[in-house]
Amino acid sequence: YKKCRPNHFVAAPTNILQIIDAMQGKSMSHCITLAGGGESMTPQQEEKVNTYLAKHGSSAKYITGYGMTEFAATVTTGLNNVYRENTLGIPLCKTIVKIVDTETGKELPYGEVGELCFHTLSQMKEYYQNPKETAETIRQHEDGMKWIHTGDLGWVDQDGFVHFKGRMKRIYMT
C-alpha cells in the first residue's frame, strides 16, 4: 500500500486497520475511496480510520457495503454522497431489501431487527446440486417474489439505510 499508493482501495476491515497502523503518519492524500466489507467494523474503529484519513490529507471517509456471492455483487453501498457512519449504506438500483421476523417470516417495520432479505436482478438461481440449501436460502414470499435469506440480522432505518446487527449463522460452502 505504501509503495503503490492506490486512489481506490477495498479490503476487509481487519486489513484496513492493519494498513492504517502500518502507515505510521504517512500521507493519505492519494486516497479517494476507502471501502470495506466481509466483516463489521466497530464505530470506534471507523472513527479511528476516518480521523487518520482526515489528519493525513485525504477527504475520503471509510465506506462499507453489503454483498454476497449469491447476489453476484454488492447490494448496498454508501457511495455517491449517501454515506452514513456505521451503516451498510442504501440498496443499489433494482435492489429491494426486506427485514423479516426470524420466527414468523413476516416483514418487520423500520427500526426493528430481523433477518436481512434481498431481491435483486443479479441474484442466483440455485446452489449447484444442493436443493436443500437452495430451498433454505431462496424463498418465495407472499408478494410472489423470490428473496435471498442472508442469515444475517439487521434493520432498515426511516431513511432507507441498512444496518448490520450480527450473523444468525456462518456458512462456508466450497
Task: Enumerate the predicted regions with their spans.
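Alpha-helix capping/helix-boundary segments
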Residues: 14-16, 41, 123
